[in-house]
Amino acid sequence: MPKLSVCIEMFWTDLPFDERIRRVAAAGYSAYEFWGWRAKDLDAIRAATAETGLAVAGFAIDPGFALTAPGGEEGMTKAAVEAAGVAHSLNCKSLIVTTGNEIAGESFEITRRRVVRKLKAMSAVAADEGLRICLEPLNPFVDHKHYWLTTMAQAGDIVEEVDSAGLGILYDLYHQQLTEGKLINNLHRHLHQIGHIHTAGVPGRHELLGSENDYAALFRAIDASGYNGYVGLEFRPTIGEEAALAQTLTLLG
């Protein structure tokens, strides 16, 4: 059975983050994740995590710089060091990074060299700290127009070139269905590189049940593949948070 994690950025959005953590536990889940850490009350988050016994599946490095943008190498590496400190305080092993948008007038290959250079430095930090950065391709059609990294093949090639235990892929089944499909094929092709998985219904980014993505089948495929990382629920509930989370559990069989 896949290990599920609730993205608290998209659930109970009217509540403080520490209370959202308590709601995750009350809903019967054992892990949560979030996006950026810099603007959050980390003391309250640590206290709620200790109180509930939940695992922290991952969070974003929150560098303040884009991997694609010229410059910022020192800032990106510093951000990785800072995020590693936060990760250790939360007993979290996975960090998330996105690339940023295309650079106008610049070829894909020139941007790619810059991204690889920055990721080599950041992943060296992660590897030294016993962590793994998960690089996330996103869809450029609905949610992230002009985003640079869009396919699993692109992400896989970068991870292969960087060649570090500190770098893997965040496989988002919502984004990749919109971008390229072939979800189970890509799961198997990149299984050795995948460090985290995200889910949401297609279209709309809502509940998993009734989605264009057959999540019951996808969960079976993930389970059968031997993947042992977390599967994050990164969707906006339309039927109420507790109902949506209970409904998701029915897809596990």
Question: Across the structure, where does each feature detected by a protein language model lie?
Answer:
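N-terminal small/glycine-rich loop or linker at the start of catalytic domains
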Residues: 1-10, 56-67, 99-103, 142
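Histidine-acidic metal/acid-base catalytic patches
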Residues: 1-28, 91-93, 149-171, 175-253
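Flexible loop residues that form catalytic
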Residues: 37, 100, 138, 202, ...
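Active-site-adjacent beta->alpha loops and helix N-cap segments on the catalytic face
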Residues: 38-50, 105
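Active-site acidic/histidine proton-transfer and metal-coordination neighborhood
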Residues: 66-168, 178
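Conserved beta-strand positions in the central sheet of alpha/beta enzyme cores
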Residues: 33, 58-60, 96, 134, ...
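A short beta-strand-loop structural module common to alpha/beta enzyme folds
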Residues: 30-39
